[in-house]
Amino acid sequence: KAIGAVNTVVNKNGLLYGYNTDYMGFAHLCDAHGVNFAGRTVLILGTGGTHNTTSAVARDKGAAKVLTVSRHPDTEKGELSYAEAVSSGAQIVINTTPAGMYPNVGVCNLDVAAMPGLEAVVDVVYNPDKTELILRAEEAGVPVAVGGLEMLVAQAVYAAEYFLDRKFEDAPVEIRRITAALRRDMLNIALIGMPSCGKTTLGRLLAKSLGRTFVDLDEEIVKTDGRSIPDIFSAEGED
C-alpha cells in the first residue's frame, strides 16, 4: 500500500493477494552490502515505480531525508536537477533509471566524483553487472558500489516463497549462490597482451572448455573496417 504497486499476485481460495517483492529484494541488497540508511540523506535518481520502492525502503530504514533527481525536475515537488544533485550533501545515491543499461552502456548522468562524503552508490540496473555509474563510484573510492543483480535474484526468491506458500530457511545462501552463478554466465573473459603471445590460442581453448563463444577483436575489426590490421596501422597509426 505504501508503494502503490504489486509485482506478485497469489490466489488464496479465490482471493487475490498482492505483494511487492522488489521492496524485499532491494532491502536484501542493501542489507547484504552494508548500506546504512539511518540518519542519511538519500538521493534517488528517477521518478518511476522503482523510485517509490527504493524510497520506501530508505524511509523504513531510517533515512533522514530522501531527495528525488529528474532530468525534468518538478520544483513544486522539490525535485532536483542532476546539476543540483551534486551539491545535495547526500551520503547515499540510488539509481532507478535505465541510464547505463545494455546496450547503452557508458551512460552516467551524475558526477559522483564531485560528491565528497558518499558512503554508498546502489544501481538497480543489473545488465551490465557494473554500470558506468558503479564504475565511476568505485574509481572515486565510494565504500559501497553495487549493481542490481542480487536484487533481481532476491525478489524472485521471495516471490517463489509466496507462490509456494513456504519460507526458504536458506534463502540468503541461495540468493548468493544464484547471483554468483548468473554473474559467472554474464561476465566476459578478456585476454590482453602483446602480439603473438598466445591470446588467440588460449582464448579458443578457454571458450571450448567453458562452452562460451570465442571472439577475436582483430577479426571483428577487419570485418567492420574492410582492411587488414597492418593496413589500418599503416594508414592511421596504432594509437
Stretches with model-predicted labels:
Residues 1-33, 128, 134-136, 140, ...:
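Phosphate/diphosphate ligand-binding glycine-rich loop within oxidoreductases
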Residues 20-23, 30, 35, 39-59, ...:
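Glycine-rich adenosine-cofactor-binding loop
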Residues 60-78, 217-220, 224-225:
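NAD(P)-binding Rossmann-fold cofactor-contacting core
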Residues 77-145:
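Rossmann-like adenosine-cofactor binding region
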Residues 124-187:
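Adenosine-phosphate binding glycine-rich loop
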Residues 199:
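Conserved lysine of the Walker
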Residues 202:
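Hydrophobic positions on the alpha1 helix immediately C-terminal to the Walker A/P-loop
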Residues 219-239:
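ATP-dependent small-molecule kinase phosphotransfer cores
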